[in-house]
Amino acid sequence: MSEPKPIQDTLDRRHSRESSISSASTTSLVFDRLAEESEKNHDASSRPHPSAARHAYTDDNSDAIKESDINDPETGPFLGASSETTPPRKGVDRKLKKVLLIVGGFFVAAWIVSLVVFLTNKSYKHGSQIDHDPAATNRKSGKRVTLDQVQSGFWRPTSHTFSWIPGPDGEDGLLLEQEARGKHFLVVEDVRSQGSADGEAHPDAAESRTLIKDPWFYWGDQQHSILQTWPSKNQKKVLVATQKQRNWRHSFTALYWVFDVESQSAEPLDPAHPEERVQLATWNAQSDAIVFTRSNNLFLRKLADDKVTPITTDGGPEYFYGIPDWVYEEEVFSGNSATWWSADGKHVAFLRTNETEVPEYPIQYFVSRPSGAEPEVGEENYPEVRQIKYPKVGSPNPVVDLLFYDVEKGDVFTVDIDGDFPEKDKLINFVMWADGNVLVKTTNRVSDVLQVNLIDIVARTGKTVQHVDVAKIDGGWFEISHVMYIPADPKNGRPHDGYVDTVIHNDGDHLAYFTPMDNPKPVYITEGPGWEVDGSASAVDLKNNLVYFRSTKESSIQRHIYSVHLNGTDMKPFTDTTHESYYDVSFSSGAGFGLLSYQGPKVPWQKVVSTPSNPKSYERIIEENKDLTQQAKKHELPVLEYGTIKVDDVELNYVERRPPHFDKNKKYPVLFQQYSGPGSQTVTKKFAVDFQSSDGGRRTTRSPRRATGRPSATSTPTAFAIWGWSYGGFATLKTLETDAGRTFRYGMAVAPVTDWRFYDSIYTERYMRTPDLNRNGYQQTAISNTTALGANERFLVMHGVADDNVHMQNTLTLLDELDLAGVENYDVHVFPDSDHSIYFHNANRIVYDKLSNWLINAFNGEWVKVNDAKPKIES
């Protein structure tokens, strides 16, 4: 926490899309449109009478857009966040907190059996549990939510993101603001400078400091627009990026410059090669050197002169230095960096990735040319093809090892660990400097055995300090967790260095303090049982020996913030636990302040608060979303019901969204939203309206069975439909296949996995092991029973042609199997040049228009006519 965090392209925008949440879903929109059709054929008197009293709207919903990932397919303006993790991850899903085992179609079968029992017993009939009106079973008349509103962001709460930055002398409570309204382009400001709750400026607030005045600079006669910035620790220089070009989800290339704050001028990072694109650049803590990757080789630039020193020379298409390849970027680091400076600036640790044996997969672009290169003469009418090194299950993984560079001696070296995993069976999951040591977490290929290694960088020796067989603990696998270093401070009760990590304890994820560094037996800071820590520690206050974290202590669908002493005593809530709430928090570099984000169930708000670590109390509301509150009062939003359903003796959460004017005496069509992916939790108390997944501790997330959602008040199987995106698309098709039309008649699958042998090795083998070890599991999970799919009324499949994550191969292989079996009860829509998020050329709007219209036609019986087409004979 001693170095400034990189800020995003747009920091602290007042109408940020970064941390936004949807409040309406495809389902409710479809029901509204179905209601419109119904009104044409029914007398107005048959409609339920609106509620007699109007109440201020406070929605109990949990369908949120992922923070910092608005374009993610699982979390667009209609979908719930697929998981709750720190840091964010994706799905086929990349927000990975917890996981469940994919074992055949058994979890789907178990869910369907439970669903049938659930419907038969009519256990869905219960009272409303809506936060803003506990007695309400319907809403008073108002405006209807429209598809255009949701897609335009009409229902998205305004939220702000802070990039906390330590002062040059360790000052706490400083923010890095980029493009803030009415200010210079890049400013360091005390969080208290804008006043407290009474509107008065805080007397202790430090003066603002401008780092960059304008969003552009000149070099020679060329003007360059600044897109991203990274200040040095002493705040005298700023590393800036211009002309960014996206690579994969997190990675990009750009032209990099060193901007001098005093002179407000810039120079190229490599003065001898100003036009060469750089993949990654990182400051040291001394603010006098930058290490960067270019053309997959690592270089060092010391600011004392213009000289650039090559650290590696054999980088290229097969070897990567200091940056991850596709699968490590996507599944391990969730970012574009594999470079780590030591705190004293004397050493650099970096990953070497050898992709020599990794097979390639072609990504085709039929409309655009993402490379920016002009086609060869005569090839103008051919698609651009990009070959991606993509390890599918069972195929060779990239071989990775950790290298070190001694800045003073100029040599590169490795440190061997006795008993380490063989190179082809090793994954490096985490690297952290701890004074003169380096902590490295590695696992075997299938991630069920963990080793924690400790390297003495001066002696150039290392040893294993922990060896954990996760499979023996609960039959699960290793979860990637992020460690916080706790330096020794004998005067403050810490005689040795240590670290805080997330470990499995009392059937859940809990925080443990390991000290000294090589001690395998920790002090458990949190213990449960019945609740767990969400992700890793949020912050550590070294002065007061306090650890802050977010947990499920009040409820698995709530999140509150707590503090606890490093010795595991004096745990206290930081947020108000007397009300159902879902909180997130971002702490300042010294943990003296926090940006507290209330995310539901009422309309979200944000405020800056002092923490128990700060002797001076401070509070300032920065966002109330008053406009959204008024909008909610004027519109008809769904009525929500929360509850649990038992699957294999495990209680799983569900949320049922009822139409605004729900009448228990009527029958309604039902749409199930599936995600169900490993690590997913989408049933929460966040402000939003959509079906969600479940999480009830380690047992439910390690279970091979998963239930998601449940029906509204109906027992008519012909009115059941199901849909999902990515893993949810797989779950949708597997449900249709297993059910064979007995419960569900319609399904919509977007970017689905249809055979896990087509997906990447690191993600899939973590849950299913390799095909050699689990051949039956892979066969059973593949969508292959075309006869069963044909027994459904109709289903829809959509996919992006340039999907680098869930390859188009999944959908095309399924279509071939359907053709061979003569199955025709389906529709297909493909999107040229769209990746997994399906956004290219208006594609995302088309996705949701298609889902909405297709579902309306399904519930109106139109697909019955299509499936049994009759020629129109003229008389």
Swiss-Prot record:
Residue numbers on the Vacuolar membrane side: 120-875
Glycosylation site residues: 354, 567, 785
Tagged with keyword Signal: no
Keyword Ribosomal protein: no
Subcellular location, principal: membrane
UniProt feature, compositional bias: Basic residues: 699-708
Mode of membrane association: Single-pass type II membrane protein
Top class in the EC scheme: hydrolase
Bias (Low complexity) ranges: 19-28
Catalyzed chemical reaction(s): Release of an N-terminal dipeptide, Xaa-Yaa-|-Zaa-, from a polypeptide, preferentially when Yaa is Pro, provided Zaa is neither Pro nor hydroxyproline
Entry's Gene Ontology cellular component terms: plasma membrane; vacuolar membrane
EC number of this enzyme: 3.4.14.5
Cytoplasmic side: 1-98
Biological process annotations from GO: proteolysis
An example Gene Ontology molecular-function term: serine-type peptidase activity
Places the protein is found: Vacuole membrane
Regions of compositional bias (Basic and acidic residues) in chain numbering: 33-46
Signal peptide coordinates: none
InterPro entries: AB_hydrolase_fold, Peptidase_S9_cat, Peptidase_S9B_N, Serine_Prot_S9B/DPPIV
Region: Disordered, residue numbers: 1-90, 689-715
Keyword list, A-Z: Aminopeptidase, Glycoprotein, Hydrolase, Membrane, Protease, Serine protease, Signal-anchor, Transmembrane, Transmembrane helix, Vacuole
One family name in Pfam for this protein: DPPIV_N
Family: Belongs to the peptidase S9B family.
Reported function: Type IV dipeptidyl-peptidase which removes N-terminal dipeptides sequentially from polypeptides having unsubstituted N-termini provided that the penultimate residue is proline.
Protein name: Probable dipeptidyl-aminopeptidase B
Source species of the chain: Verticillium alfalfae (strain VaMs.102 / ATCC MYA-4576 / FGSC 10136) (Verticillium wilt of alfalfa)
